[in-house]
Structure formats: C-alpha cells, structure tokens
Curated annotation (Swiss-Prot):
Organism: Schizosaccharomyces pombe (strain 972 / ATCC 24843)
CDD domains noted in UniProt: AE_Prim_S
Transcription among keywords: yes
Residues annotated as binding a ribonucleoside 5'-triphosphate: 131-133, 182-188, 342-345
EC main group: transferase
Assembly and interaction partners: Heterodimer of a catalytic subunit spp1/pri1 and a regulatory subunit spp2/pri2, also known as the DNA primase complex. Component of the alpha DNA polymerase complex (also known as the alpha DNA polymerase-primase complex) consisting of four subunits: the catalytic subunit pol1, the accessory subunit spb70/pol12, and the primase complex subunits spp1/pri1 and spp2/pri2 respectively.
Entry protein name: DNA primase small subunit
Binding annotation for Mg(2+) 2: 131, 133, 333
EC number(s) recorded for this UniProt protein: 2.7.7.102
Binding residues annotated for Mg(2+) 1, in chain numbering: 131, 133
Positions of the catalytic residues: 66, 131, 133
Amino acid sequence: MTVQIDELDDKDLDEIIANGTLDGAKQGAVDSETMIQYYRHLFPWKYLFQWLNHGPVVTNDFAHREFAFTLPNDAYIRYLSFSNWEELKKEALNLCPSRFEVGPVYSANPRDRKTIRKSTFHPLKKELVFDIDMTDYDDVRTCCSKTNICEKCWPFITIAVQVLDICFHEDFGFKHILWVYSGRRGIHAWICDEIACSLDDRSRRMIASYLQVVVGNPQGGVRLINNLKRPLHPHLTRSLNILKSAFVKIVLEDQDPWASKEGAENLLKLLPDKDLASALRKKWEVDPERSSKNKWSDIDTVLASGSIASISPSVIAIAKQDIVLTYLYPRLDVEVSRHLNHLLKSPFCVHPGTSRVCVPIDIERMDSFNPLKVPTVNDLLQELDKNSQNDNGHGPTMETNTTENQKDNARGQSNKGHGFSTSLNPYTLYFKSFSSQLFKETVGNKRKHENLEF
C-alpha cells in the first residue's frame, strides 16, 4: 500500500532516511543500486531543467515547480522543489526514487507551503498533458490484453498520436508537443506552449471534452462512441480520413477481431438494421472461416444485392464510419488532462515493471518507433561498462573487484554526463533539441512583450 508523505518537513524526511525506514523495497525489475547508477550517469538532468525552466538562468518555472518522488517502498513524497538541476539530482541520488513526477508551478515555493497562508498558495501553470493507455483498447485488440503489448497492437497508439498531433497543431495552434513513451503500454503528450501551460481547469476540461469521442460501454463489450451528429465536425472528418487509411491493416488484418462467432456478433451489434444483421449472420454460418476483412466487405455486398429494403446505403455508410471511429479513434484518460494540479511521470524515468526508459519520441519517427526495442536501464549500464573498457584499453569491468569510485569514473568518462555513448543518445539529443526550440520561442515572446511596453 502506498504511503503518502506529503506533509513532512525536511527535518522529518532526514530522520526517516537516517532510521532506514525507506528500506524494504518491493522486489521489482530494477534494484536501488541500478537506479542510483542510472541517475548518476545517464539521466539528462540538465536538459530536464532547461525544458521546465525555459532558459539557462533559474526562474520560478523551475524553482517553484512541484516534484513528487515514489520511493522504493512505495512511500510517496509530494511538494518537493529544487533551486537547480544539481539539487534535483542530489536528492534523487539520496532518496533513489523508483520514479518521480512533475507537477505545476506554484505561486510560492512548494517547500514553504506550511509557512504561508493557504489562500496564497495555488498552482499557476503546468503543461497541458494527455495520456493514452493500451489497456483501454482491450475490447478491440485480440493479440494482447492488460499490461501486455506487441508489434500488432502498438499501431493503435501510433495512429492515435497522428490524429491528436494534427489536431493540437491545426485546431489549437500548439507548436511544442513532447510525446513520451510511458515505459510499458502507453504514451504521454506534454503540450509545452506558454498559452497551454497557462490554461485554467475549465479550459483544460473543454479541450479534453472536445477530444473525447470513445466512451465506456455499461453493458460491456466493445466501447461506444458519443452520439455524433452529421455532418461530422471538421476535426472528426479529418480524423476519419486518417483512420480509414489504417483501418484495414491495423484492425481487419492484424487484429482480425470478427473472425470468431463471438467476434462477429460484436460487429453485428454495431449495425443499425436487424434485417441486415440477420442476413450477414446466415451468410457467415455457412462460411464460418471468413476473415474480418471479408466480413467487412460482406456488409456492402449484401446491401448491394437489394435483398435488404429496410435501410438505405447512406445509413450503413454512416454506421461503418462510426465503427472505424469506435475501433481506432484515440482513447484518452481525460482525468489526466482536466486539472492544473495533476502530476505526471517525468520523461526519462524508468518503468519499474519493464526496466524500460520513458523516452521522448520524435513525431517524425513515430511510425518506426517500437516500444519493445526501447533500451532498459540494465542494457544502458552494460553499454556504459563496455564503452568504458574500450576507452580505457580493456580496463576493469563491472565483474572485477574494482571500487565503486573506479567504476563510476570509468562510466563517467565514457558517458560524458548524459549517456551519449549509449543507445539512449538519440532520445537525449532529441529532448535537448526540443528544449532548445521551446526556450528560443519563450525568449522571443518575452522580447516581443517587452518591446510593446515602451
């Protein structure tokens, strides 16, 4: 059970550490020593600072930012804040969190919240965030379920990102969108534009509602979509055009969800005419081996035969559009997006269950991104050791009886601080580039504002 330590003073926290009550970590994929090595040699602390601070000189965008640590024993510490990235790194090495989250910028330093009036302590701004979790597709994917993913079902996430990214740019004018793999089965979007960070809860709820199309089904089975009016909203028309091009490959071929009798019934339930459903059911009983792709085509074939007079082709066309949206439109955890004070796992954290790093993804390379090939923290440390051996001329390995300082020095020389000699390098460089572009625009906006105040 998670223990919240959100009301502790620094003195209290120091006492807990001194008494060793942070021990007793769960047996997981990543041990504390591995995490310490990762935080010391691989985590891009400086670039994380530049991303959140929007510049090289410390501002309240970083100094008044809330961080929350999840400790190895599942204790959860909120309202941490730091003056610079060195302090953040030092605390991470001290407490060795299994993960940490980023929250809003507050009106005062979160560490001082007990010494000021509650009315003066409130969140001011935070990136607008979105979360897509593969488990929300369990009713339409056949290859995996729960926390499992594979190369067949990950395209559900890929096409969802494509739909949302275009929407963020074209419908809202956002420019700086950081997509981050969650480490196991999902993806997070951080919209970092200044105007997005300043949105209040009401505005965030409106944007989340604008994007929410697929909702739960009280009766179970395939999820439903909101009652969509025709003609479709331009956002949905654009989204449908994107999704239709991927529907055959992702749904009909890779998932083949209607191959079985039970699966076929799920399709028939989504059709608005009982006579059409009955005719299709009889056809498939005669030929039960028909694939989902063939059954999808059968809808038009039976309708074109003229044997079903109770419904028009236009109604069926609309129904098929709705089915495409039901299966492929992005499924969002909207609660993540609705509130300014919501915390979200930081980029480059390590997922404790998979050991994979939560890497940022270049949107231009989203189609080729494979979550199963994302480096694990153990892979990265092995790469560092191998590179340190090469750099030192067959120097000491992690298996020899060298001291920890010798190992650290070897790793540090090879790593140059941010894992540039490992497979984390492309993700780190992309994050650096993203942060630099965000900083340039932030500075440009400030200069424009200053020029207007003459």
